[in-house]
Regions:
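Conserved alpha/beta-domain cores
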Residues: 1-142
Length: 142
């Protein structure tokens, strides 16, 4: 198995090649190191290699890692987010990638207003309309 540095170098090379093929600048793309279920020591090693954007899929795990890892990490919520957990991450995340309902968006807005912050989000759309998948239906989009 490749070590973390070799793996990161390979991913970076792949990103650079994809950017070149697409006529894009490397700076147009954000590499997010997905940290879910990984130990703190491993995340610190990855951080030491350069990445500053980390993705987490569980609020509690994200909050625990935020407490002990460097404060300049930009955290991304990449998993399903329950409305009762929004208050724990608003104002602490770079981007919420998985807003899958109007109800959730309204809760994010409510918590953001309480903290006087702006929250960047991505809306998750269930294009395939699969019942087992999260996301709003395409008819609900503007």
């Amino acid at each position: 198995m490749m070590d973390l540095q070799e793996n990161l170098q390979q991913v970076e090379a792949n990103i650079c090649k994809a950017c070149e093929n697409a006529g894009r600048k490397r700076s147009d793309v954000t590499l997010i190191a997905v940290s879910k279920t990984k130990p703190i020591e491993m995340l610190q090693t990855v951080y030491d290699l350069g990445p500053r954007d980390f993705g987490e899929n569980k609020v509690q795990e994200m909050c625990e890692k935020m407490e002990v890892l460097p404060k300049d990490i930009r955290w991304h919520m990449i998993g399903h987010l329950q409305t009762n957990k929004v208050k724990y991450i608003v104002g602490k995340t770079e981007l919420i990638h998985s807003v899958d309902s109007l109800h959730l968006a309204k809760e994010i807005e409510k918590q953001a207003a309480k903290q006087n912050v702006t929250v960047s989000i991505l809306v998750e759309v269930n294009i395939a309309e699969e019942e087992s998948k999260f996301g709003i239906h395409k008819e609900e989009t503007i």
